[in-house]
Curated annotation (Swiss-Prot):
Part of the ACDS complex that catalyzes the reversible cleavage of acetyl-CoA, allowing autotrophic growth from CO(2). The alpha-epsilon subcomponent functions as a carbon monoxide dehydrogenase. It catalyses: CO + 2 oxidized [2Fe-2S]-[ferredoxin] + H2O = 2 reduced [2Fe-2S]-[ferredoxin] + CO2 + 2 H(+). Cluster B is an all-cysteinyl-liganded 4Fe-4S cluster; cluster C is a mixed Ni-Fe-S cluster which is the active site of CO oxidation. Cluster D is also an all-cysteinyl-liganded 4Fe-4S cluster that bridges the two subunits of the CODH dimer. Contains two additional 4Fe-4S clusters, dubbed E and F, that probably transport electrons from ferredoxin to the B cluster. This is Acetyl-CoA decarbonylase/synthase complex subunit alpha. The keyword Zinc does not apply. The gene is cdhA. It comes from Methanothermobacter thermautotrophicus (strain ATCC 29096 / DSM 1053 / JCM 10044 / NBRC 100330 / Delta H) (Methanobacterium thermoautotrophicum). Its EC number is 1.2.7.4. One of its GO terms (molecular function) is anaerobic carbon-monoxide dehydrogenase activity. Belongs to the Ni-containing carbon monoxide dehydrogenase family. It comes from the Archaea. GO terms for biological process: acetyl-CoA metabolic process; response to hydrogen peroxide. [4Fe-4S] cluster 1 binds at residues 73, 77. The keyword Signal does not apply.
Length: 780
């Protein structure tokens, strides 16, 4: 088989026994010795969409859900024209405040997307180097639609690891165009910047799917296993008598090779391997013997505890002062990716034993090793030799020392002023000076303090407040023993067939996905309580990353974690841990599969029809209660483009932009019924696309509300409104005053609340309206 390429050679004369020709041009391309299966036909109108190809869909979303901007400041300081004040003015380049905010949002989304894309590129290239380009993508007999995002965006199914390189090439090309639009004197419209942010979010979705797909098939991670094992979670599960290797970050390769080295040398029981953040999630997907310390909020506390003999860092969400903190108690640091070199010498080509000796003897502060297999050997050998030397360092300041340190406090109050959650830090320190550690202990046990360390930076007496908080909570650390279900990967096709109709018709009231980071306003318990609320109400609860860990750190009144109480099936009352940050792609993927499997919508190149279906029919809502990073911004924006609303915590307003609907503007909610061709009155469902709630109570009510969809059957709508009203009464004390907007006919009214609701309807002069048969925002 000859694959024609553009390079060519010309022959002036070509003669033979039966051939005589001149000026023949022959193109010779790659010679392929093995026949490849024919590529699937591209079915949809827009495969591999360029920056503007989905702009019309974006504008429909932005017309309904107008951007609400909350800038940190009114200045633009991006070029040497500035700095320019934009409050009621334009900058020297002509940009206004809204457009500048939209550009900032696009930049944040691109940073997040680049982080996931860089991660995916690392994985794909390394795994191809190990296994070859022809390594098959196979998720088992229960998953036929193994890459729903890739199929929809690229227009074809990836069959091998090599095919994923093509996906990465496309995403990286799009990111280059998007970033160029941020240059001074380029895009000048805020909504077009938002359209580009949507495209960046879609590229983020795409590259996350590539990353998780590659590691699932190449490392044999669970392939949609609803019975994925329960693994250990919490400080108290770590055996501090053993050498301890701690992995921090998101790239599974170094951690997997550490586990492999232990296994190959029959040392599994001699060394503890644990992780913080998504590295922990993915290492336990690879080997259930590894342990999860907790979400990224545990990072500084655990490093300060001195438990880790070796700290292996890869990429994303690692404290940039990790080396400085590790050196305080002689923990060895190994950096493993080009994203985070920490100023360390590159030891990739050095003999492993030499690296170990240099680390043990303090000849180097740490090592940069870009070969994951070598990381495995060096990390284990270093931990084995360093642990006996460091045994006396695995402790925090004693109680008397804490009292002495606290007595240095000058009552300046700066620790409280700079605390992101305005915790009573100074009061806790003052009580500690009197020998009362209860307030410090409360901050540790209730996870109110997520150890950002800003209080220490401001303290004029250099009081190590985070270390004091950690020590105060130490006596309870031994009780921090929980169970979390290992990340299972995508929803199986058979599960989608089972739940597709109940979700679209409203019989299952919704799919709620708790994702994101641990920048919580009042601790991780809030996430667990919200998850518990919706599990008890028959929702499907999906989770990933730090959110999955926070849910696991809660025990109910029976002493069980929610993972022990609820199964891992993608079905009503299922608590589904899909995996790490990159596994968030399976949340969007499940919604896409519903459109394909239940509604028979073709995927390939058919983004707009799929997104339109999800927006109007699939009752799903994302919750990023502790979102802090640019990655979280990209994830939320990508999910929004598919038509899935997201609720943020109060810190989410710092992303500078929300997508809020106006329920009072009836024109914005009109729908086209594709079955009849008529434009009909709609309802604010979902009312918002990106919303920041002030507290758990408000968020819980809003989540239930954002699962309402125009296609709910009367029975399904009754169920959804029953939850909405019940939660509103439970947390806010009243029946919602907008309930009339969601009653289409009297059949929608929950029987339990019929009298109260009918009274409201009469007061508001409510009129019944027609139910849409096939609602859409599209013209066709």
């Amino acid at each position: 088989m000859i694959d024609v390429a553009p390079e060519s050679k010309k022959a002036k004369d070509l003669k033979g026994d039966f051939w005589d020709a001149k000026n023949i041009q022959i193109s010779i391309g790659e010679i392929i010795t093995e026949e490849k299966p024919p590529e699937e036909e591209v079915k949809g109108p827009k495969p591999r969409p360029h920056v503007t190809d989905l702009r019309s869909w974006d504008m429909k979303l932005l017309e309904r859900y107008e951007p609400f901007y909350a800038p940190f400041c009114d200045m633009c300081c991006l070029c040497t024209y500035g700095k320019c004040e934009l409050l009621g003015k334009k900058g020297a380049c002509g940009i206004d405040a809204a457009t500048q905010q939209a550009r900032t949002v696009l930049l944040a989304c691109l940073i997040g997307t680049a982080a996931h894309a860089g991660h995916a590129r690392h994985l794909v290239d390394h795994l191809i180097e190990r296994l070859g380009e022809d390594y098959k993508i196979d998720l088992g007999s229960n998953v036929d639609i193994e890459a729903p995002i890739t199929r929809t965006v690229m227009g074809k199914r990836p069959a091998t690891l090599g095919d994923l390189r093509e996906v990465m090439d496309y995403a990286e090309e799009q990111m280059s165009h998007l970033l160029s639009a941020c240059h001074t004197g380029q895009e000048g419209d805020s909504k077009d910047f938002e359209s580009k942010a949507f495209h960046a979010g879609l590229m983020d979705d795409l590259t996350r799917e590539v990353a998780d797909l590659a590691q699932i098939v190449a490392l044999d991670l669970p392939k949609g296993d609803e019975d994925a094992p329960l693994v250990e979670l919490g400080f108290g599960t770590i055996d501090t008598e053993k050498p301890v290797v701690l992995c921090i970050g998101h790239n599974v390769l170094p951690g997997a090779d550490i586990v492999d080295y232990l296994d190959e040398n029959e040392m599994e029981d001699q060394v503890e391997v644990c992780g913080i953040c998504c590295a922990a999630i993915d290492v336990t997907r690879y080997n259930e013997a590894a342990k999860v310390v907790g979400p990224l909020s545990k990072q500084l506390r655990f490093i300060r505890s001195g438990v880790a003999d070796v700290i292996v860092v890869d990429e994303q969400c690692v404290r940039t002062d990790v080396l400085e903190e590790a050196l305080k108690n002689r923990s060895a640091v190994i950096a493993t990716t080009d994203k985070m070199c920490l100023g360390l010498p590159d030891m990739t080509d050095e003999d492993p034993d030499k690296i170990v000796n240099d680390l043990i003897n303090g000849n180097i502060e740490g090592a940069l090793i870009l070969d994951p297999e070598k990381v495995g050997e060096v990390a284990v050998k270093t931990a084995m030799k360093l642990a006996p030397i460091r045994k006396s360092l695995k402790k925090l300041p004693d109680i008397d020392e804490i009292i002495e340190l606290a007595s240095e406090c000058t009552d300046c109050g700066w620790c409280q002023r700079v605390c992101p959650n305005s915790l009573p830090v100074m009061d806790a320190v003052k009580k500690a000076a009197d020998g009362d550690l209860s307030k410090l202990e409360e901050m540790a046990i209730e996870e109110l303090c997520y150890t950002c360390g800003r209080c220490e930076q401001e303290c004029e007496r250099n009081i190590p407040i985070v270390s004091m908080v950690t020590k105060a909570g130490e006596r309870r650390v031994k009780d921090e023993k929980y169970r979390i279900r290992a990340g299972r990967g995508p929803a199986q096709d058979v599960e989608i067939r089972r739940v597709g109709a109940p979700i679209v018709l409203g019989d299952i009231p919704g799919v709620v996905a708790f994702v994101g980071c641990s920048n919580y306003p009042e601790g991780g318990k809030d996430v667990a309580l919200m998850a518990k609320e919706f599990l008890e109400r028959n929702y499907i609860v999906v989770t990933t990353g730090c959110g999955a860990m926070s849910i696991g750190e809660y025990r109910d009144e029976d002493g069980q974690t929610l993972y022990e109480k609820y199964g891992g099936q993608f079905d009503a009352k299922g608590l589904v841990n899909m995996g790490s940050c990159v596994s968030n792609a399976h949340v969007s993927g499940a919604a896409i599969k519903i459109a394909n499997i239940f509604a028979q919508k073709p995927l390939e190149g058919n983004f707009e029809e799929i997104a339109d279906y999800i927006l109007n029919r699939v009752g799903a809502c994302g919750v990023a209660w502790g979102a802090y990073s640019q990655k979280a911004a990209a994830i939320a924006t990508g999910v929004n483009r598919w038509g899935i609303p997201v609720v943020l915590g109060p810190h989410g307003s710092k992303y500078r932009r929300l997508f809020l609907g106006r329920a009072d503007d009836e024109e914005k909610w009109k729908l086209k019924d594709l079955r009849t061709g008529e434009v009909i009155d709609g309802e604010p469902a979902p009312e918002h696309l990106l919303y920041a709630a002030e507290n758990r109570e408000e968020a819980t009510v809003m989540i239930a509300k954002l699962c309402i969809r125009p296609t709910d059957t009367p029975k399904g709508r009754q169920m959804k409104l029953s939850n909405y009203i019940d939660l509103h009464r439970k947390y806010l004390g009243t029946i919602p005053d907008d309930i009339d907007r969601f009653i289409r006919t009297e059949k929608d009214i929950p029987i339990v609340y019929k009298r109260d609701v009918m009274k409201i309807l009469e007061e508001k002069n409510w009129k019944p309206r027609e139910l849409p048969k096939e609602p859409s925002l599209l013209e066709r």
